[in-house]
Each structure stands twice: as C-alpha cells, then as structure tokens.
Amino acid sequence: MAGLSSSQIPDGEFTAVVYRLIRDSRYSEAVQLLSAELQRSSRSRAGLSLLAYCYYRLQEFELAAECYEQLSQMHPELEQYRLYQAQALYKACLYPEATRVAFLLDNPAYQTRVLRLQAAIKYSEGDLPGARSLVEQLLSGEGVEDSGGESDYDGQINLGCLLYKEGHYEAACSKFLAALQASGYQPDLSYNLALAYYSSRQYAPALKHIADIIERGIRQHPELGVGMTTEGIDVRSVGNTIVLHQTALVEAFNLKAAIEYQLRNYEAAQEALTDMPPRAEEELDPVTLHNQALMNMDAKPTEGFEKLQFLLQQNPFPPETFGNLLLLYCKYEYFDLAADVLAENAHLTYKFLTPYLYDFLDAMITCQTAPEEAFIKLDGLAGMLTEQLRKLTIQVQDSRHSRDDESAKKAVNEYDETLEKYIPVLMAQAKIYWNFENYPMVEKIFRKSVEFCNDHDVWKLNVAHVLFMQENKYKEAIGFYEPIVKKNYDNILSVSAIVLANLCVSYIMTSQNEEAEELMRKIEKEEEQLSYGDPDKKIYHLCIVNLVIGTLYCAKGNYDFGISRVIKSLEPYHKKLGTDTWYYAKRCFLSLLENMSKHTIMLRDSVIQECVQFLEHCELYGRNIPAVIEQPLEEERMHTGKNTVTYESRKLRALIYEIIGWNV
C-alpha cells in the first residue's frame, strides 16, 4: 500500500483504509492520505484528529500540536483538544507554550492530568521546588476534584525522579525499587533504577538492570536487530518507533556505554553504542549523538566536533554537551574557539557549567597567552580542592572510627569525585612547565601532590614520564613504570606502546638488559598470538619499542646500530609502517642527515645503501599512509599528495643523495 493516493481508494473505503494503516503502525502513509484529504476539506474534525494522532505517534510533536490547536479553535467546547495540544507542546520541549495552554484548562474533569503535566513541565525546566509542590498536591489529593487521583505507584516514581534531580541518588533508588516491586517489570522504570545506581557509582547493580532490559528487549522484539551492526551485518534502520521507545533499549545501551567509558573499557563502550537497534544518523536522539561524538573522538575528531556543535544548536541538548565541547577544544588546543563559544553562549555558562568547570576552562584558555597568570588561577583552584580533600580524609577516618559505614561510604565517594577534579588541574599546572621543558619544576609539582595522588594511575604515569625525560633518573622512572606494566602483564598490549618503550630504555640505561629483553619477548609473544586470530591487523607495540631504542642509540651518536635497529623494527612494512612509526623513523633519519651534512659522522657505504633501500620500501608501502595526522578543525589542509609517507621518504632519499654526492 506504499504510495497509495486518495484517488486509488474505492468510494466509502477511505476511513477503513486509514484505520488499517494506523492499526499496522504505518503512520507515515496515513499522514500522506489524511494531508491530501484535508487539502480538500480543511475543517474535517475526524481528519484533523487522526492526523494529530499520527503525528504524535511519529514523534512529530510540533505538527501534532498545530493540529490540536486547530481543533481547539474549531471546537472550543471540547477541552480535551487543548489538553492534547499542551501535551504535544511539552513533548516538543516548548515548555513556556505548553504552560500557557495548560493554564487555559479549568475543567475539573482534567485537573489531575493538568497538574501532572504542569509538574512534568516544571521538572523539565529545572524548577524542582515547583515540581515537588505539584507532586505532593497530587499525592495528597488536595484541590483535586476529578476521580483520577495520583496512585501511590505514580507518586513513588515522581518522587524518585525529584530525588534523583536533587542529587539524592540512593533515596531515588529506594523509590524506584519500591515502584518496580509493586508493578512488576517495566523497561522505563528499570532504566530509572539503573540510572540512579549509576549516578551513585554502584555500577554492578546498574549493569544488572541494563542487562535485564536488553535481554527482554531482544527476546520480545527480535525485529529491532540488536547487535547486528556490531557483527557487521548490513541492516536497515528500525526507525524511531513507539515500540523502540517502550523497550528503553536505546537508553539502556547509552547508559551501558557511559558505565564502560567510566570504567575505561573503551572498546566495550563503543560496542554498546553499535549494539543498539540500527537507525539512520538523522534519526539518532541527542544522547546517542553526543555519546557517539565523545567515544569516537580519538578516531574521528572532526566528526565528533561537528556533532557536538550541531547539538549545541538544538533544543534541548544533553546538559553535558556544552562542557564537553569546551573541554575538547582545550584538549586539542583550540583555545580561541573555546573562548568564542564561552563568549557567545554566556546564558549557557551559568546553566551548564559548575563554578569549578568554569574556573578550570578559564585557566586553560588563559594558558595560551599568559601561562604565568594561568598557573596562578590553577594554583588557586588546586588549593581549594586540596583543602576539600583534607577535610574529606578526616571525615572518612572519623566515620570509620565510629563505625558509621554509610557516612564513610558517602565521604569516600565525595573524596573520589574531588580527586577526579583535582587531577586535571594538577596536570594542567604541570603541562605549563612541561611545555618550557622545565622538568625539575614539573617533578616538584607532582611531589607536592603525592599526599593525595600516590595511588592514582594517571599521576604515576606522568611522574614516570617526567623522571624519564630528565635522563639521569631512569632508575626512579622504572619504579613508576614497572607497577603499571606488571598490573597489565597478562594483557600487555593494553599498555601504551610508549610506556613499554620507555621502560625498556630505562632498563637498558641502568644496565638491566635481561629485563628489557624479557619484556620485549613478552610483547612479541602476545603480538604473535593476536596475529593468529587476525593476520592483517597492524600491531605497533614491539615496533615502537625498537624504534625508541634505535632513537636512543642515534641520540648517543651510535648511528650504525641505531639506524639498523630502526630499519629492522619496521619489517614487514605492510604491517609495521604507519603514521606513528614513520614519525619515529624519520626523526632518526633527519638527525642522521643533519650530522652527515655537518661532517660530524661518517657512515659505511653498506649502511648508506641499507638506508636507501629502507626509504625505497617506505615509498612503495606508504602511498596511502598519512605522514602526519592533521588537526581536525584546520582550515588550510595539507596537499594530499604531500601528506604521505611516500612523498616524505622520497624527500629523505633525495637529501641522502645530495649529501653524499650521488648522481641519480
């Protein structure tokens, strides 16, 4: 019946056809027929009413509201149309308009429904005291004349939502749990409970309820294609249907992704997003779009920025969007863009940024032009946070001493949250001196924070890096790198390649060659096992370790051994040559060429021949490999022909020929 027009429908069958389409949830086709019919008879009450219903089911709430507005003007005596108009406006997030229409309703028969709607509007607008007042009025039955008073079940849910918004997550859990036990399984209620558990950092019970939602959704609605995209199966969009909304699958997968992201299981987080029922990009809800942008930022930063910028223009958008966009601008050092967004959206600053986040962003933006001033701002922020950490430490100790487990748990959670705020401030301070290569000062900043951060992995990793960079503290660097590596020894490829490389170099520089060799054998073994399952997968860990070791020997002037190590590390080229590995290799070659041009070193002909052959291989295998990864928002893009390993390897080969006087 796709594309059916009014003229094709036999006389007297139009209404039956429309109702059949609605029965089969083919609302778009029903809209086409009804719209065409209303062009001929624009004041048809039945036609407008059905059209409004179809728009509502298609989640085209503004269009539904327009239809209901026409109906209420045509039939002012039928107040249900005004109520439906207010509900559609609320669903379209047009809260002032919905409030205005709701206030026009004075029929006692609709009083409870109007109060519920007004409470929902105030809740969505962030007016929690106003929402609570209306919810309590409904629960008490005060001033409610119609018979449809608020049930205890609805009341528990509404109070749970208010408690959640007020930050009382455990109390919200109790309300949702009571409602769930009273009603039996409800997908949206299970999601509310999972969200409250997540916000109180109780990830295990949150994941349990999420798994329940997903399992039931798959069993009851196999047509929604859960997991198909992850498995690489090409499937068509399931659309934003009412059935999809009722299953709460989209919400559950987004929450699962958020939990995995918090637990730093980034692959699992991305998989949660691809597991959700397939939809076209234009059909995605704001939360999914936001999470996709965030979790694919490393691989697709340009797309990520575009999605976040797009969301910022929508009403509403996820409240985290504004802060995350600004933080990512700072991460990629687009400080001017961050400053512009802050200046252009002052009204959002007070609504979506906490004082801490605003002060942090202000300091980060200041770093670009006035690093000394930025350091002072960050120092003030750090001082405030360390004071909070000390107070919370005392609270934890006092609670444990008095055996008040609940207070101790609350204080520990607050301590962890405050520490997560302190670490970025500390790292931003350290980066100011790192950029000036003042490594002793960076070390001093880290040592001042040892009281709070000595168990934090990010802190330990950065302490290791700054000790390593000072070149006379390799032994101390080992003390920080080793625990990180040993913690993940059974899954060593999950450790950053540069951490493994720096640890190997530190072993070599402290004459612990056996430890370095053992670590490299372990990496090689894991890479071999991984390549059995996926022979074409590029794995760079051992390659980067060898490149860094080769770089070390080149830096010490032993180019014969260093360059040979670099060359061997990139074999086989089809698996080892990449943007990152080329970066390390070309640095060594540029250093070699500089010293050759100054006549400070002499290389054997066999080594020069080896270099030329290496660059020829890089030219052959590097045609489709970018020489550098461009910044995502760069206005002037590099010439595509020049931004390849092939182009740069030719340039290096030409320089070799020029320096040694070979004719080509």
UniProtKB/Swiss-Prot annotation:
Q: Which residues form a coiled coil?
A: 507-534
Q: What is its main location?
A: other
Instruction: Report the subcellular localization.
Output: Cell projection, Cilium
Please list the residue ranges covered by the TPR repeats. 11-44, 45-78, 153-186, 188-220, 385-418, 423-456, 458-491, 543-576
Q: Which SUPFAM superfamilies match?
A: TPR-like
- Listed Gene3D superfamilies: Tetratricopeptide repeat domain
Top-level taxonomic group? Eukaryota
User: One biological-process term from Gene Ontology?
Assistant: cilium assembly
Has UniProt tagged this entry with the keyword Protease? no
- What keywords are assigned to this protein? Cell projection, Cilium, Cilium biogenesis/degradation, Coiled coil, Repeat, TPR repeat
Q: Which GO terms describe its cellular component?
A: ciliary basal body; cilium; intraciliary transport particle B
Q: How does it assemble?
A: Interacts with the IFT B complex components IFT27, IFT46, IFT74, IFT52, IFT57, IFT80, IFT81 and IFT88. Interacts with KIF17.
Query: What does the UniProt record say this protein does?
Result: Required for polyglutamylation of axonemal tubulin. Plays a role in anterograde intraflagellar transport (IFT), the process by which cilia precursors are transported from the base of the cilium to the site of their incorporation at the tip.
Instruction: Name the family.
Output: Belongs to the TTC30/dfy-1/fleer family.
Protein's UniProt name: Intraflagellar transport protein 70B
User: From what organism does this protein derive?
Assistant: Mus musculus (Mouse)
